[in-house]
Amino acid sequence: MIEAARSFPQYQFVVAGAPGIEPDFYKQYIDSSTKIVFGQTYRLLQQAEAALVTSGTATLETALFRVPQVVCYYTAAGKLVSFLRRHILKVKYISLVNLIADREVVTELVADGMTVANIKKELAKIVPGGSGRPLMHSEYDRLIAILGEPGASERAASQITALLKSNHKA
């Protein structure tokens, strides 16, 4: 990540530290120009121009903040994982954004695909002025429409309650 960050000197790189991970853990991966913040992920996303995100709910949260992102997931067994993904595993995507959209909305750099060169190339596409930024914003709008308006759990609970009441009367 440090090498990739050096290619974008006009931006401040900030790491949103994960709960339960000590700050010292991150120091081996970053240099003094990169900040680490804890407990302020949403505030950070409100300010972000683009993001490198590990897979999980963070990818969906980043999309809901409409921050263009590249999903990065490294594993020491990169070649094996890449082989398994291509030939055995049935899941096309690892990020919630792509799984929900059922197509590639965000680039996933996984296992041996996560290289400094690939990070730089994909990040350049989504920073302001990048060629992929407008399309990603458009795809985020589509994703948000798929997810529906806020209050989905309340609407689901109301529908379940109504269904139970109607079945109880029958």
Task: Name each model feature, range by range.
Residues 1-170:
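Nucleotide-activated sugar donor-binding and catalytic core shared by glycosyltransferases
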